[in-house]
Amino acid sequence: MKIVLEEIAMATDKEVLIKEFLKALHEDNAAIFAGAGLSAASGFVNWKGLLKEAADELELDIEKETDLISLAQYFFNKNGRQRLSQLVIDNFSAEAQLNENHRILAQLPIDTYWTTNYDRLIEKSLTDVGKNPDVKIKQSDFALLKPKRDAIVYKMHGDIERASETVLIKDEYEMFHENNQLFSIGLKGDLISKTFLFIGYSFEDPDLEYILSRIRVLMGQDGRNHYCFFRKVNRNQYNHLPKEEGDEKFRYDSIKQELKCADLERYHIKPVLVDKYEDITEILQTILQRYCRSKILISGSAVEYKQFVPDHNTAQMFIHTLSREMVKAGFKIASGFGLGVGSAVINGSLDYVYSTNKRKISDYLILRPFPQYATNGLELMDLWDQYRRDFISDVGCAVFIFGNKEVNGKVVDAGGVRKEFDIAVAQGIKVIPVGATGYMSKTLWEETITNYDKYYSDFPALKADFEFIGDASHNHHEIITRIIKIITALRAGR
């Protein structure tokens, strides 16, 4: 029973983290604090790995040492700074590959990163997705603003390229708040105003503990909640020990972990326990997936609407109302400005925006009209294909309506809508063809409903709603209601 209750509690903690961090992302106040664990999957060492050679030389057992800052100080006392700096260079100069956690974080709209890591993987992950990071390594960097920056990366303990200036020994930790006041002030401000997710961080650094304690004194019970990951102590970790010794070590470490988690709550840091480190990637992937599913592509084109309604105005009002209700429900709409569809999408979206006191249209609508002539030696069809793949990759769901065009005086199904459906499926984006609107969307709906488990094995409860939106005889407002129900369930992950 205790194990079952623990599993329920862990699942609840994960869901709360996902919900709250998504909220922070949508409000543009999410931040990351990265420790050595974030880079471990890329092959870089943690603190113990960094100081193992130093411990061996001091005739100490690195596995028995818990105060690694003092260990670094002992090595410095005996050998000077150059040897320590060389250890940093030897362990962090290798060209490492980004891991999945880096890639996921870089795709999220996070503009603030704090890290104690010396490597440059965070910066690389951001540049790889076309973002422009502004990196702060020393105090003088605060006075310099990188033009058109997308994110700030605060490297409070230094950088591999300045190994001799990294924060590593007890002397440097003790003087951190004197020598790095701008980092301390900046971190305090962000911890008060943003929601942090701590990844790969052990909370052993005295400089962060000092900052957290100051915030606790200043804010009391009004502090903002933050979240961190810990791997839950597992009995299997001690199977290499004799049974009695393993049992005792497991019991001791479990108690210590519980106490540490409870202590972090004093600073409004909510620990989320995972069974294995891969679970962190799964949680981050869920956050990315749900965030993207708040952005909806409306794909479609039309020169006529007869398979759905007899007249143009009724069809335009359907598209208008659908777009308006999507924006009202908190979704951001992306449109390629398809013929006969795009204008109504814009009007419906603006109808809601202008009915409120919100005026930042870019928060609700992404317009990506297709290029009309070829450039850079590409054929126009190839350029369109590349363009489609680019803007579809930025959404999490795609709604397909109508889908026809005129060729040689005849109305035929639109191949472009078919292509966008195939691209979306290939990219793992959830597809919602509204079969009731006819034409290519009807064909795509038939494929989806016939192979429902292929597309929606994780959402069996939505099948009746998908069946409903394929029938043109239903009330148009009810069809829209069902579409909103589907995309809302997809965004929530259930």
From Swiss-Prot:
Disulfide bonds: none annotated. Residues 296-494 are annotated as: SLOG (STALD) domain, binds 3'cADPR. Its EC number is 3.2.2.5. The active site is at H157. GO terms for molecular function: hydrolase activity. This is NAD(+) hydrolase ThsA. Keywords: Antiviral defense, Cytoplasm, Hydrolase, NAD. It holds the Pfam family SIR2_2. One of its GO terms (cellular component) is cytoplasm. Probably activated by a signal molecule generated by endogenous ThsB1 and/or ThsB2. Can also be activated by the signal generated by ThsB of B.cereus. The activating molecule might be 3' cyclic ADP-D-ribose (3'cADPR). CDD domains: SIR2-like. 3'cADPR binds at G300, S301, L339, F370, R388, K405, G416, E420. Its main location: cytoplasm. PROSITE patterns: SIRTUIN. Residues 11-295 form the Deacetylase sirtuin-type domain. It catalyses: NAD(+) + H2O = ADP-D-ribose + nicotinamide + H(+). GO terms for biological process: defense response to virus. NAD(+) binds at A30, D119, H157. Belongs to the soluble Thoeris ThsA family.
